[in-house]
From Swiss-Prot:
Family recorded in the similarity comment: Belongs to the potyviridae genome polyprotein family.
One family name in Pfam for this protein: RdRP_1
Enzyme Commission designation: 2.7.7.48
Annotated protein name in UniProt: Genome polyprotein
Catalytically driven reaction(s): RNA(n) + a ribonucleoside 5'-triphosphate = RNA(n+1) + diphosphate
Site (Cleavage): Q388, S389
Provenance organism: Papaya ringspot virus (strain W)
Length: 675
């Protein structure tokens, strides 16, 4: 495919590029000014050949960021922005030049200059030279398919979807900047003493000596001579006010940290265009990362993230460990390259295991913030969320050293408890408060009494209850304590006595003992996961013994199943779900029941078997998927209550008499017709 693309490019056969509007929210001012941005995507047959032409030069270009006057290929993290801003001398005048309608204003003259630079840097290869010339001819004069089906051919401007857009734009601004400096009378040597600038695409950032600030006034005119519209009036004396690529650097601990405008960060949270809940969580995490440096904003985003993780379906993702999170120490490491201290890590580990010693909740999510409280605990629906202060923000990585230390602490506390018990048993006359090491509080004679907080009763006398002769037929005291398990009273599974009778019947028919039944039922459960529990199945079912198939008759399974085989197998629902999850932990596994229903989400595989028991803990997506699969399996199916009755005869006596002159055995004559 790459060779065919190169061949097309060499022969000058242009592809049709696809023009479309950018999927973005634009300010009202931009919309009213009709500055809607478009995107021009390269066709595949041009794209592959184009990458062959430009990739080597582009990779070299990226490697020279900050060494040369461009930042293409730099990272804003790990003190990258600090290195960038410190390239500008202190006390100079800083200008963030603003270019408007950049791509559409580029002239063929500038594009041809980029072509000349690439040809100069290219190895001696005649075929590649022709491909490169044809590529930039196609970029300049591009056939574009518009959304209404019209194909137009442009004659100027760069294409936003070509594989070297940013590098080419940077080169064209670089050429124009050198042109403006030369025209202002500065050669290479004098330029280095009075001007430092960096470019990234159409973004231009300039630092100029105060004695030469007037030169900026002539730059707009010089840029316009080459077709570019730039404004050089935004000038600053403080580096922190300098905007470049929509970022400005703010000083935190003497390091310049790149920051977007707070409104842009909030917009990441406001505009939800994600199709999957995982993508929504990733967007919130991205906003959390971008907000670091704006203390209050980061705190509010963490609070919002805490709330989101309590809502469906995000709470299910968190329980499965699929909710991304970045700690305060992780963010500090990302921006400043500083590792978290051992004290911070140990504080986190201590707090973690302190919470873990109790009953393990369904979900533990640790959140860090800049709030004054060290830890704020919020509990909702068995969900524990911890807010951790910045001072104790630590990384979540656990190492063996901390685990060993925690085990030692546990052993010491156990010994201490045993010692206290022994001391308490020696003195039986010691009061309870003394045994526990706590003193009774003195009574304050000046108190005026206590107030009792009223409790609302679950059942009141005002409830409308079923009654006979004025007396309620319900025992409310018993009802308050009666909380049976749903599965124990569900009519979708056989009762325990029915299951035991089925077990005994199958065991006797198969001639197995209890230990053999355990192994056999493992195989039966896996077979039913794959093949279902329809009452119409017959023949044999199969279990594997290594590479050998072992057959078992199905008849005993169905005969002893009351009320139905599916209701018997419902007892295996939880084990089957765990088995599928276990298989998916080591390989991609979807039961045949899910494959037949074309279930594409592998995370729902654990619910893709027909004897799964839906309960109140089943996630909404899983419940919907299971119901849809069941509806698809049962569609247009019907069962006959009666088959053909073989004992009923439809015989009758035929008293018809025929002679040899009759036409046939059903007709005496042809009613007068003759041959």
């Amino acid at each position: 495919l790459v060779r065919k693309s190169c061949e097309r490019l060499y022969e000058g056969r242009m592809g049709v590029w696809n023009g479309s509007l950018k999927a973005e929210l634009r300010p009202a001012e931009k919309v009213l000014a009709k500055k809607t941005r478009s995107f021009t995507a390269a066709p595949l047959d041009t794209l592959l050949g184009a990458k062959v032409c430009v990739d080597d030069f582009n990779n070299w270009f990226y490697s020279k960021n900050m060494e040369c006057p461009w930042t293409v290929g730099m990272t804003k993290f790990y003190k990258g922005w600090d290195e960038f801003l410190r390239k500008f001398p202190d006390g100079w005048v800083y200008c963030d030049a603003d270019g408007s309608q950049f791509d559409s204003s580029l002239t063929p003259y500038l594009l041809n200059a980029v072509l000349s630079i690439r040809l100069w840097a290219m190895e001696d290869w005649d075929i590649g030279e022709q491909m490169l010339k044809n590529l930039y001819g196609e970029i300049t004069y591009t056939p574009i398919l518009t959304p209404d089906g019209t194909i137009v051919k442009k004659f100027k401007g760069n294409n936003s979807g070509q594989p070297s857009t940013v590098v080419d734009n940077t080169l064209m601004v670089l050429i124009t900047m050198y042109y403006a400096l030369r025209k202002a009378g500065y050669d290479t040597k004098t330029q280095e003493d009075m001007c430092v600038f960096y470019i990234n695409g159409d973004d231009l950032c300039i630092a100029i000596h105060p004695d030469h600030e007037h030169v900026l006034d002539s730059f707009s005119r010089s840029f316009a001579e080459l077709g570019l519209k730039y404004d050089f009036t935004q000038r600053h004396r403080n580096k922190q006010n300098l905007w470049f690529m929509s970022h400005r650097g703010i000083l935190i601990d003497d390091i310049y940290i790149p920051k977007l405008e707070p409104e842009r960060i909030v917009a990441i949270l406001e505009w939800d265009k994600s199709k999957l809940p995982e993508h929504r969580l990733e967007a919130i995490t991205a906003a959390m990362i971008e907000s670091w440096g704006y203390g209050d904003l980061t705190h509010q985003i963490r609070r919002f993230y805490q709330w989101v993780l309590e809502q469906a379906p995000f709470n299910e993702l968190a329980k499965q460990g699929r909710a991304p999170y970045v700690s305060e120490v992780g963010l500090r490491r990302l921006y400043t390259s500083e590792r978290g201290s051992m004290d911070e890590l140990e504080a986190y580990i201590d707090k973690y295991f302190e919470r873990e010693r109790g009953d393990s909740p369904e979900l533990l999510v640790y959140h860090e913030s800049r709030s004054t409280d060290d830890y704020q605990l919020v509990c909702s629906n068995n969900t524990h969320v911890f807010h951790q202060s910045k001072n104790e923000a630590v990384d979540t990585g656990l190492n063996e050293k901390f685990k060993e230390k925690e085990k030692q602490k546990e052993k010491e506390k156990e010994k201490q408890k045993e010692k206290e018990k022994d001391d308490a048993s020696d003195g039986n006359d010691v009061s309870t408060s003394t045994k526990t090491g706590e003193r009774d509080r003195d009574v304050n004679v000046g108190t005026s009494g206590t107030f009792t907080v009223p409790r609302i009763k679950s059942f009141t006398d005002k409830m409308i209850l079923p009654r006979i002769k004025g007396k309620s037929v319900l025992n409310l005291n018993h009802l308050l304590q009666y909380n049976p398990q749903q599965i124990d009273i569900s009519n979708t599974r056989a009762t325990q006595s029915q299951f035991e009778k089925w077990y005994e019947g199958v065991r006797n028919d198969y001639g197995l003992n209890d230990n053999e039944m355990q192994v056999m039922l493992n195989g039966l459960m896996v077979w039913c996961i794959e093949n279902g529990t329809s009452p119409d199945i017959s023949g044999v079912w199969v279990m594997m013994d290594g590479e050998t198939q072992v057959d078992y008759p199905i008849k005993p399974l169905i005969e002893h199943a009351t009320p139905s085989f599916r209701q018997i197998m419902a007892h295996f629902s939880n084990a089957a779900e765990a088995y599928i999850a276990k298989r998916n932990a080591t390989e991609r596994y979807m039961p045949r029941y899910g494959i037949k229903r074309n279930l594409t989400d592998i995370s729902l595989a654990r619910y893709a078997f027909d004897f799964y028991e839906v309960n109140s803990k089943t996630p909404d997506r899983a419940r919907e998927a299971h119901m849809q699969m069941k509806a698809a399996a049962l569609r247009n199916t019907s069962r006959r209550m009666f088959g053909m009755d073989g004992s009923v005869s439809n015989k009758e006596e035929n008293t018809e008499r025929h002679t040899v002159e009759d036409v046939n055995r059903d007709m005496h004559s042809l009613l007068g017709m003759r041959n």
